[in-house]
Curated annotation (Swiss-Prot):
A Gene Ontology cellular-component term: cytoplasm
Catalytic activity field: a ribonucleoside 5'-phosphate + H2O = a ribonucleoside + phosphate
Gene: surE
Reported cofactor(s): a divalent metal cation
The entry's keywords: Cytoplasm, Hydrolase, Metal-binding, Nucleotide-binding
Protein name: 5'-nucleotidase SurE
Amino acid sequence: MRILLTNDDGIHAEGLAALERIARTLSDDVWIVAPETDQSGLAHSLSLSEPLRLRKISDKHFALRGTPTDCVIMGIRQVMDIKPDLVLSGVNSGSNVADDVTYSGTIAGAIEGTMQGVRSFALSQAYLYEDGARIVPWEVCEKHAPALLEKLMVLDLPEGTFLNLNFPNCRPDEVDGAEVTMQGKLAFNLQVDARSDGRGFPYYWLKFGERAGAFVEGTDIHALKHNKISVTPLKLDLTDYSVTDRVARALGYGAQV
């Protein structure tokens, strides 16, 4: 089995090293095409205004000056001589749950793999800030991901569907199994931090405020809160079929879908 790895935290990220160790429990034919620099929050974006620069680090290890989407495209269409059987994107430093999935470059890696016709999974590891430092328990995903992936790889997923895996912030022995979930809802509370440079010109940082939401049972955020691995099936089709009839009636037509 051939596996292509990517991420959005960059080629030197600890999560990518963890993902490689996970992948090597499944296959010895593991390829990496990951961004040269951190591409967090770029979602499913393409580089169309600048050329892509590919750097070979070692055999089957490449860094690309581009987005996670660029990396998957380059990996499948340029770097690898034979199409991979599996695309793994991650392991992200921090969970990708609720509305996070719309911003996530990690999710985008799995989206692009799916669009290229390859079974794809996104993996993310929740963490805790302690005394101003980010403490990421990589050992959780490293312990539990291999067996979980072995079970999930045999699934006959519908075309256009991929899986979003999130691992809880706890000790490996505290993980209370895996749960199939749906997306939850968290308020982002994004804030704009206005500053001035040394010449008095304004510049701005986006930052997250306190996040709040209802941790409804069955959602990804509820699963993580209760030390469960969240497995959420996601699909490329963004059509809201529940309102197509109403939209059609508003336009004076019959049902269209």
